């Protein structure tokens, strides 16, 4: 079950995260004592070839984020209970990978436990955006992740990053798309199959569509055909 994933993005000049986001946006310190802050030191294992090719091609690496207490059911429920709901999106998906169906699900007044139960039992995914700004523990974890990458990858030194937590049902569809900003997807719990298609190959995506995505004038979703398989 692909229950939780941390999607961390590195940005260029178009995107900047303030060094000290507004204090009222953070919720962690109100309820989480210092002793409960994450002790886990992220461990990322990249081969020598992957370090040399980082940022030039898709890479697969191992990590230990699944050992963090931040991704247990109890921690996810607590996060959802205290998370600013205007930054949380619940979306129900369809069954046809060629037909994009993301229906917004209302979650006002729905507890974190109820949301997590709906994810486990349905065809739903939660897009917990800006999780690093809403909870300092996740910000600290992402900072440690990038500190590891910076130490391992020559020339890698991002000036800004942000994190999104994805909590998805085992049967939820992730539709064919292309991410604009450079992204790292850290799969944490459950099992997930991922299809990656050749970059800049116009059999799978037209260059004009990619240009529109990077220019911010169209959504990241792309037309999908079963012939791609």
Regions found by a protein language model. Give the residues of each.
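Transition-metal
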Residues: 6, 12-15, 25-147, 164
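A short glycine-rich, His/Asp/Glu-containing loop-to-beta-strand
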Residues: 59, 159-167, 205
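Long, hydrophobic, well-ordered secondary-structure blocks that form the structural core
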Residues: 138-153, 157-162, 173, 187-188
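Short, surface-exposed loop/turn motifs at beta-strand boundaries within globular domains
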Residues: 52-56, 121, 158-160, 169, ...
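Short, conserved beta-strand element in jelly-roll/cupin
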Residues: 166-170, 179, 183-193, 198
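Short loop/turn motifs at secondary-structure junctions and domain boundaries
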Residues: 175-177
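Double-stranded beta-helix
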Residues: 189-229
């Amino acid at each position: 079950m692909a229950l939780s994933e941390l999607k961390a993005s590195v940005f260029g000049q178009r995107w900047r995260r303030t060094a000290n986001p507004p204090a009222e946006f953070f919720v962690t310190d109100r309820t989480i004592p210092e002793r409960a802050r994450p002790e886990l030191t992220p461990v990322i294992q990249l081969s020598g070839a992957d370090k040399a090719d980082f940022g030039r091609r898709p890479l697969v690496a191992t990590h230990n984020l699944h050992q963090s207490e931040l991704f247990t059911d109890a921690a996810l429920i607590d996060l959802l209970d205290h998370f600013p709901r205007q930054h949380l999106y619940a979306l129900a998906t369809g069954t046809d990978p060629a037909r994009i169906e993301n229906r917004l699900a209302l979650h006002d007044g729905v507890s974190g436990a109820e949301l997590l139960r709906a994810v486990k039992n349905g065809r739903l995914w939660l897009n917990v955006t800006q999780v690093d700004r809403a909870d300092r523990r996740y910000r600290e974890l992402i900072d440690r992740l990038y500190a590891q990458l910076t130490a391992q990858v020559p020339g890698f030194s991002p000036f800004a990053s942000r994190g999104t937590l994805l909590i998805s049902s085992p049967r939820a569809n992730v539709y064919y798309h292309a991410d604009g900003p450079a992204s790292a997807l850290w799969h944490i719990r459950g099992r997930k199959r991922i299809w990656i298609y050749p970059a800049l190959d116009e059999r799978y995506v037209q260059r004009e569509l990619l240009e529109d995505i990077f220019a911010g004038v169209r959504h990241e979703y792309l037309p999908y055909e079963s012939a791609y398989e």
